[in-house]
Amino acid sequence: MNLDRPCTDILTEAWQRYAFANDAGPYLLIPQAVMQPRTEQEIQAILASSKIKRVPVCFRAGGTSLSGQSVTDGWLVDIGRHWRSIESLDGGQRVRVQPGAIGGLVNAHLKSYGRKIGPDPSSINSAMIGGMLSNNSSGMCCGVVNNAYHTLESIRFILPDGSVWDTSQSSEAVRFRTEKAQLCNELLAIREAILGNPSLLDKIRRKYQQKNTVGYSLNAFVDYQEPLEIFSHLLIGAEGTLA
């Protein structure tokens, strides 16, 4: 792991950095560098290096954000460059995609099966799956029932400490409880506090019956019991702040 150059593809020229200085919103922040990782190992190296150098990191997919979520004056990590794999499963009943895949192209891939993904944001032909998960995309047609949160089966993610987790593997729940015991205990404590407060429990249930993208997906504490499942669903709508 080369912490001085954590990624093969690093853009540092002024014109390159200016090209990534804004997204679809009105904000302008010029990144110190734009990194385009190809592997999980490079992402781990970026996270480790940023911690040592004390440089903030912002991950960006399609850059269709309207509120400045995908701009930074630190290191901008562009995952839309290389992470574009789309794989249909079970005759199109499920689809496994990387975060740089454009939503519209995923639907085009599924069209022959008569299927499409749940979220249908207006930016679907530009927005990428990573961003759609990060802001819990929905749309005019899918509503809440088929938003990103409710149509997620499993997710593979990297924590800021570099550890990799894959919720499609049944053994991961036990490993998560073992290696992330403190985090698990805190998640379960929050869940117990919510379940023990009838008015708060009712409020969370009511609030998430309609589109709600303010803050973290607190309904994860109500919908799931296993810490890894709670955490993985907190990632949906977390704007990349957790993993």
Task: Report each predicted region and the residues it spans.
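N-terminal accessory segments
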Residues: 1-25, 30, 49-57
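C-terminal substrate-recognition/cap domain of FAD-linked oxidoreductases
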Residues: 11-20, 220-228, 232-243
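Short glycine-biased active-site loop of nucleotidyltransferases that positions the nucleotide triphosphate
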Residues: 25, 66-71
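N-terminal glycine-rich flavin-associated loop
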Residues: 25-57, 75-122, 133, 137-189
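Conserved phosphate/anionic-ligand binding catalytic regions in large, soluble enzymes, centered on
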Residues: 63-66, 132-140, 228-243
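Beta-rich nucleic-acid/ligand-interaction surfaces
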Residues: 124-130
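Polyanion-binding loop/helix "lid" in catalytic or ligand-binding cores
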Residues: 190-229, 233-234
